[in-house]
Each structure stands twice: as C-alpha cells, then as structure tokens.
Amino acid sequence: VFVSVPRVYEKVLARVQASLRSSALVREIERTRDDLDRSHRLLSAKQAELESELQSAADFVRAQLPLPGMPAPGVSMQWAYQPSLALGGDLFQVSAWGSETLGLYILDASGHGVAAALRAVALMSFLREDNLAKAVGSFDPGAIITEANRRFPLTQDGEYFTLWVGRLHLPSRTLSYAAAGHSGAFLHSLQGDSQWL
C-alpha cells in the first residue's frame, strides 16, 4: 500500500482549517447572540421608560380637566373622558371668567398621541382667563375663536384644532357660544330637555 504524504497533509490541513472556521463562526454567533440579548434588554428598558413617561403625560393632561360637580351655584357638570390612546388631543374645561361668568370649551387637536396632546395643552393655555383678558380683551366666544384661529392656524403638515367655546352669564343664565369645526356640547336643562349646541 502506497500512501501519498502530501495528499494526507492537504486533507488534514483542510479539516483543521474547516474546524477553525467553524469555531470562529460559533464564536461569532455567540457574540451576535450576546449583542442581540443586550440590545433587547436595552430596548425593553427604553420601552418601559417611554411607557412610564407617556403615562405621566396622560396623567398630567387628565389633571388639567375640571372636576365633575358644581362649578357654580345651580350649574352641574358631568363628563366622561376616554381618549382613544393613553394620550390624545381632546380636552375641555369649565372655569370662572370673571365673577359672573363661566367659560366653557371643548377642543380637539388633530392626530393622536404626544404631539396632539402638546398642541392641545398649548391651546388650553391660551384659553386661560388671565391670558384671554390680555390676548382677546373680552370673553366673547366669537372673538376668542377668531384669535385662536389667528394664533393656531392650519399648519403645512395639516395639523389643526376644532374648538367650541361657551360663555355662561350666571345672573341671567344666558349661554353664548361659537364653534369652529367642533360639533359642540350637549346641554341638559333642569326641565329634562336636552339639545346639542
């Protein structure tokens, strides 16, 4: 039997090289798996942080809403607030605008999520009593909507607000209101009559 040494040497060398490549590939796969595990842990931690921040923002927006009950003698208010996401651009408020007037508004910033909520809170800040006195000079619903439209126009990205503003004069029980794209509010009288405004 004749055995060629160079041939055996080439086979052994090829097997050793294949084994080394396999070992290197195994080490590379293990490193990649470790990197993926580390990335997954980081992403999970970041997701938990973002969800916590989103919940905190949703809690802040909810805290801006009025409390159910009687904002003024003889005026009862009930509401349910259920945004489609944890956070959205729908807000409303009832607050004193002077000693004899209640201001009411319902607003909706287009879109959903954080961006819509931030735009809604910006408009809500504009609608505060002290700001309206300076910016508009009155609590007239039409004038308020006109100024809101000037300050918060339709953007190039298509972002917009719909808004309903009401003013209830308490001594006379007179409600005046204006709407800009919003369907309005629901009024229920003591006599049991209900109507959309």
Predicted regions and their residues:
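C-terminal output helix
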Residues: 6-16, 20
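Two-component signal transduction core modules
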Residues: 2-3
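The C-terminal output helix
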Residues: 17-34
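… and, occasionally, acidic/histidine-rich disordered N-termini of signaling adaptors
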Residues: 38-197
